[in-house]
A protein has these predicted regions:
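Bacterial N-terminal signal peptides
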Residues: 7-15
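Positively charged n-region of N-terminal signal peptides that target proteins for export
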Residues: 1-4
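Non-catalytic accessory segments of hydrolases
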Residues: 18-108
């Protein structure tokens, strides 16, 4: 019985340590990208606090951390311009495309 319990505990530990494809940790928390055949795409990653209210016309402030996994699979609203359709003052987001087999060390 003890052996079975030990095996189950070890299996659960390994399962918990496994990485989820397209999931990475960034400054504010964990994000989930869109995994495609030859790349992973992260859309709408917040990189600073929204420049609204008291933060309007101020230098960017650090992003507010979130709990859980933030889905980063759709583009964030555009910055205010033109007719304002599909736009928002909350526009400090970035988009990242990475090769499917990205390496930890820099590429040339």
């Amino acid at each position: 019985m003890k052996k079975l319990l030990l095996i189950v505990a070890a299996a659960l530990g390994l399962w918990a340590c496994a990485t989820v494809p397209g999931q990475v940790k960034v400054t504010g928390g964990t994000i989930q990208g869109l995994v495609l055949e030859d790349m992973t795409v992260y859309k709408g990653i917040p990189f600073a606090a929204p420049p609204v209210g008291e933060l309007r016309w101020k230098a960017p402030q650090p992003v507010v951390a979130w709990s859980g996994v933030k889905e980063c699979q759709v583009f964030a609203p555009n910055p205010m311009q033109g007719n304002g359709e599909g736009c928002s003052e909350d526009c400090l987001y970035l988009n990242v495309w990475t090769p499917a087999k990205a390496r930890r060390k820099n590429s040339p």
